[in-house]
Amino acid sequence: MNSPATLAAKLPWSEWLPQQRWYAGRNRELAAAEPGAVVALRDDLDLVLVDVSYTDGSAERYQVLVRWDAGPVSEFSTLATIGSADDHTGFDALYDPVAPQVLLSLIDSSAVRSSSDGQVSFAREPDVELPLDAYPRVSDAEQSNTSVIFDRGQAAILKVFRRVSSGINPDIELNRVLGRAHNPHVARLLGTYEIGIPGEPPEAACPLGMATAYAANAAEGWAMATASVRDLFAEGDLYAHEVGGDFAGESRRLGEAVASVHATLAEQLGTAQATFPVDHVLARLSSTAAAVPELQQYAGTIEERFVKLVDETISVQRVHGDLHLGQVLRTPESWVLIDFEGESGQPLRERRAPDSPLRDVAGVLRSFEYAAYGPLVDHADDKQLAARAREWITRNRTAFCEGYAAASGNDPRDSELLLAAYELDKAVYEAGYESRHRPGWLPIPLRSIARLTAT
């Protein structure tokens, strides 16, 4: 068998990568894709970092674990089959139960694997147990990474980063900080792995993945909220507080959990004073309005709102950065926040930058609107349903803010203009996203923008 690097270089990366749901280059023209680093984890399993370049001059690096076999394997789908190299076939190994178990075992033993391209270091956190005998299954959630669940005993979830970059990964960093501070609203970090490149300083290592505790009986916040909305819509003669699936109590508890996480991050990593990021939000507004004609009628008013805050001093700290109902889980004990990566499309430096806690609050409030208005996408003219949706939103916004205030002593509603600005910035981002990916959902952020600019 040829060397891992030789075989990996012969795979048809340019054809295979764009088919993967975690591939982020669909709006650009791919120029080239080739392995930049290859490290053998065992004889038939290689860790490959694929360097991708685009015709606009941008570049990215993706992690793929490649399992080799003598020929096609029936258990692998066409999507998981990368292609052939000499007399071997390469597969995305995360769809092979053996490969995730190998990764978890390497983390458990804090192993090291090296090649001329780099050194992969695995590390287990102190005083933790990993479910080495559990059978893995790949999560079917739509996301920018690939998560593998080990559901037995002390269950774990292994998140393998797909688009990778050098530097401190905020998801690992903040989970470690919160876990070591014993905050009850995060999943405990169990271990990590990263690659160091020859000639580069240790701080330039590239994080590749992390394992955290997994709550098998947890419910996703988004699923709970949308179920509550469906219950309300089905009970036409009842108010939101009268419906059996009322979500307000959970919204209040979620507010308390978010405030707790913010408090721990402030205690452990500090706070600072800064001015409202007017340049950043104006730049997003300008680029989005140019791409979304439906947004242009509101752009002038939104700009005025942002400019009014140019001299506003705000307290900033490390925050979640991309908080919404899909990033929270309800366990039997409490709410748990997950995925502390920040906005995945932003550079690492920006994702680690301190921001106002109102950024996270606004994210949850925007998510309430999505949960309630989502069912109206196909019923745009139903005024009764729209009124019911607004009732649900108002009730849950109030409950969340009350919970946050009770836990922190700071009511987000007291910073009305700032909170509205963060909501507007988030809605502008959503308008750009929906215009590109789900045009039918564009009315949701536009409805919110119309409301926020009218008050």
Swiss-Prot record:
Q: Which GO terms describe its molecular function?
A: ATP binding; kinase activity
Kindly indicate whether the keyword Iron belongs to this entry. no
Stored Gene3D superfamilies: 3.90.1200.10
Q: Which reaction does it catalyse?
A: D-maltose + ATP = alpha-maltose 1-phosphate + ADP + H(+)
Keywords of the record, alphabetical order, are: ATP-binding, Carbohydrate metabolism, Glycogen biosynthesis, Glycogen metabolism, Kinase, Nucleotide-binding, Transferase
- Enzyme Commission numbers on file: 2.7.1.175
- A Pfam cross-reference name: Mak_N_cap
Pathway(s) this gene product operates in, as recorded in its UniProt entry: Glycan biosynthesis; glycogen biosynthesis
Superkingdom of the source species: Bacteria
GO annotation terms (biological process): carbohydrate phosphorylation; glycogen biosynthetic process; trehalose biosynthetic process
Q: What does this protein do?
A: Catalyzes the ATP-dependent phosphorylation of maltose to maltose 1-phosphate. Is involved in a branched alpha-glucan biosynthetic pathway from trehalose, together with TreS, GlgE and GlgB.
Fill in the subunit field for this protein: Monomer.
Family of the protein in this entry: Belongs to the aminoglycoside phosphotransferase family.
Q: What is this protein called?
A: Maltokinase
Species assigned in the record: Mycobacterium ulcerans (strain Agy99)
Instruction: Give the gene symbol.
Output: mak
